[in-house]
Amino acid sequence: MVVKVGINGFGRIGRLVIRNALEAQGVEVVAVNDPFIPLDYMVYMFKFDSVHGRYKGTVEAKDGKLIIAGKPIAVFGERDPASIPWGASGADYVVESTGVFTTIDKASAHLKGGAKKVIISAPSADAPMYVCGVNLDAYDPRRPSISNASCTTNCLAPLAKVIHDKFGIVEGLMSTIHATTATQKTVDGPSNKDWRGGRSVNNNIIPSSTGAAKAVGKVIPSLNGKLTGLSFRVPTLDVSVVDLVVRLEKEATYDEIKAAVKEAVAGPLKGILDYTEDALVSTDFTGNTHSSIFDASAGIALNKNFVKLIAWYDNEWGYSRRVVDLITFVAQKDGNA
């Protein structure tokens, strides 16, 4: 059975969730809401993409609907989530991808329009967070609004799980070298809450805060309080990399760590975590559907208890694929697929 989905917010993640749903199948987007983007502009934005290239299928506007690959998608322009007629369009699940309605209270407004469940494509202060391959066994169908966590948490958590399960993590620090996102400034501008964040992304490396490492403690409770981290925003369009430094409980050679990751890649984390020994750079991972790609040739060990591990992720494409995967999973558990 196909899961019918609505998208609130036709930004980077909203559009790429649709592209991934078309690729992965099993999920059909039947409605889109965005009060700031008219239908003809939606066609243009979906067709052309500076990172992932031109959409190879057909996309057009017809009779007030967005037609992608021959399938009609209802289009709404409501500012209030409670006013979006999801039920009338057949959408059971809603992807909240505006980055605005990220709490349970705000996201749950979608239920008033007929949605059965909301998946927030961002970290949430109070909604339960789920990371595919890590804590889906903790899924509670009774919760109407859930979070897919952040792209960085989706990269870090699977790797941290493998290392923690096999060797134990005493403590760790993470840095993410993160590609540009839509909220950053092209030229220096005002940013009262984050002064450095107001500086031009085009010619700067910008230190920034991130809750991604701490959030791992929410999806892997035994790591709660053991990880924290920061971010450096860099002037690239897509693909980011996690640099994880950990102290291990059990001694392990770097070869033993590589073997543990390989085992997980071939087993329980297949499709989520990947492994490479090739001498790759960031653009080589554009369009990669994995949450995390362990770079075996980039990591180093100081000794058998202290190691630096490197993992890449397409913070747009890989994350959007996990949104689709999470929808598929919860629909099955909810009995709607």
From Swiss-Prot:
Listed pathway(s): Carbohydrate degradation; glycolysis; pyruvate from D-glyceraldehyde 3-phosphate: step 1/5
Keyword Glycoprotein: no
The keyword Kinase is annotated on this UniProt entry: no
Subcellular compartments: Cytoplasm
Enzyme class: oxidoreductase
SMART domains membership: Gp_dh_N
EC number of the protein: 1.2.1.12
Binding site for D-glyceraldehyde 3-phosphate: 150-152, 181, 210-211, 233
Gene3D superfamilies on file: Dihydrodipicolinate Reductase, domain 2, NAD(P)-binding Rossmann-like Domain
Residues annotated as binding NAD(+): 12-13, 34, 79, 315
Site residues, Activates thiol group during catalysis: 178
Active-site residues, record numbering mapped to chain: 151 (nucleophile)
InterPro entries linked: GlycerAld/Erythrose_P_DH, GlycerAld_3-P_DH_AS, GlycerAld_3-P_DH_cat, GlycerAld_3-P_DH_NAD(P)-bd, Glyceraldehyde-3-P_DH_1, NAD(P)-bd_dom_sf
GO molecular function: glyceraldehyde-3-phosphate dehydrogenase (NAD+) (phosphorylating) activity; NAD binding; NADP binding
Catalytic activity: D-glyceraldehyde 3-phosphate + phosphate + NAD(+) = (2R)-3-phospho-glyceroyl phosphate + NADH + H(+)
Gene Ontology cellular-component annotations: cytosol
Pfam families per record: Gp_dh_C (PF02800), Gp_dh_N (PF00044)
UniProtKB keywords: Cytoplasm, Glycolysis, NAD, Oxidoreductase
Swiss-Prot/TrEMBL GO biological process terms: glucose metabolic process; glycolytic process
Entry's family note: Belongs to the glyceraldehyde-3-phosphate dehydrogenase family.
Record's subunit section: Homotetramer.
The protein, known as: Glyceraldehyde-3-phosphate dehydrogenase
Species name: Omphalotus olearius
